[in-house]
Amino acid sequence: MSKKGGYKGVQVDHRYNDESVARFINAVMLDGKKDVATKIVYDAFAIIGEKMVDENPLEVYRRAMSNIAPVVEVRSKRVGGATYQIPMEVKPSRRGALAFRWLKQYATKRGGRSMAEKLAAELMDAASEQGASVKKRDEVHRMADANKAFAHFRF
């Protein structure tokens, strides 16, 4: 029997009491600097609260995550000397991880403001089904749709 305890999971976020926000903070974190990542995410939520007065920043965040998260993706499989792109359904944990990764990636690529402002802008765009991260999700869905013919090669 193992002496170590199992995986305890992510602690909920102390301000919004939400596990998804805590996971997002961990995704934004660089080089183990969690305080910096927490400040960036909370400042982004504050900016969303200022710009979208009638909406709760947490609801904007949730709507953005559901708009970014992919349902299907393509995976490569080698069959008889040829490599096929096979459309596969994305597991819920991977959906969230991809959404976090794309949101962080495209927020970082935005113009030269603070990271909190760039993250807030990308979240607001994603909540209204615009922005680069939503385009990335649409591109992944288009690739899966284009390769439907190879769906019978499933793993």
UniProtKB/Swiss-Prot annotation:
It holds the Pfam family Ribosomal_S7. GO terms for molecular function: rRNA binding; structural constituent of ribosome; tRNA binding. GO terms for biological process: translation. Keywords: Ribonucleoprotein, Ribosomal protein, RNA-binding, rRNA-binding, tRNA-binding. The keyword Nucleotidyltransferase does not apply. The keyword RNA-binding applies. Part of the 30S ribosomal subunit. Contacts proteins S9 and S11. Belongs to the universal ribosomal protein uS7 family. One of the primary rRNA binding proteins, it binds directly to 16S rRNA where it nucleates assembly of the head domain of the 30S subunit. Is located at the subunit interface close to the decoding center, probably blocks exit of the E-site tRNA. This is Small ribosomal subunit protein uS7.
